[in-house]
Amino acid sequence: MLEKIQETADFLREKMHTSPETAIILGTGLGSLVHEITDKYEINYKDIPNFPVSTVEGHSGKLIFGKLGNKDIMAMQGRFHFYEGYSMKEVTFPVRVMRELGFKTLFVSNAAGGTNADFEIGDLMIIRDHINFFPEHPLHGKNIEYGPRFPDMSEAYSRELIDKALEIAKEKGIKVQQGVYIGTQGPTFETPAEYKMFHILGADAVGMSTVPEVIVANHCGIKVFGVSVITDLGVEGKIVEVSHEEVQKAADEAQPRMTTIMREMINRI
């Protein structure tokens, strides 16, 4: 594993014209944030040694280097999901590579179903904590020397970055929610009974990604900020049939607000 991480990092280091310290993982319908990136240099996943290739509609599969505002960044346009058949080691491989390249901060975004009755479709939810409901843990097996055997997860999402996001949202007049995200393996959307269970467990939103990458980022000592776009509701009386296309549409409509918050945050760190 370490040899593959180092091989991939060496390959990317040769292609990089700058030394960014901020990375962004873009989820379903949120890939259009890349239009905000200037001085772009793109590498297709299929051309990167040891990188998996995303198979999901709406995830184009590129690594993008450039500037967001005045900061050098790297963006993953398309992520890898456990439900695609990848192991957790493969799902989180890019985060290990980020650590090897010296990244300090990771911004993650996703589309999620809301279980909180106060939420509406299109809301942005700042993730303040998560529940890991995946059947396999990304740190299972021999510990990689990037972090401790038993990592602390008491601040999986940086409180400093959360406070900064709330400040920016207030300045810009953008409505945001806060809550707990629960990560499940998918690929089915949740049944009404599952939504109810997740709410009882303490989740405000549910999705099929993010948690594995955040766990590994914490293991590597990378600070994390996460935001979910609420694309459907699992609240009694508000549950409707949902499709991937509808999820993408809702995420696309929320994208300008998320872009504003992300851009401002990255410029201020």
Protein language model regions, located:
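Metabolite-binding pocket within alpha/beta catalytic cores that recognizes anionic/polar moieties
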Residues: M1-M153
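Generic non-transmembrane alpha-helical segments
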Residues: F11, K15, E160, K164-I174, ...
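Non-catalytic positions within long, well-ordered alpha-helices that form the structural scaffold/packing
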Residues: R99-E100, H199, N218
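Short acidic/polar active-site loop segments enriched in Thr and Asp
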Residues: K104-T105, D204, K223
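Polyanion-binding loop/helix "lid" in catalytic or ligand-binding cores
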Residues: Y146-Y157, G183, Y195, A250-T259, ...
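Active-site/ligand-binding-proximal alpha/beta "capping" segment
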Residues: I162, I168-D204, M262
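Zn-dependent metallopeptidase/amidohydrolase metal-coordination segment
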Residues: M208-E246
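His/Asp/Glu-rich mid-to-C-terminal helical/loop segments that flank catalytic regions of hydrolases
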Residues: V235-I269
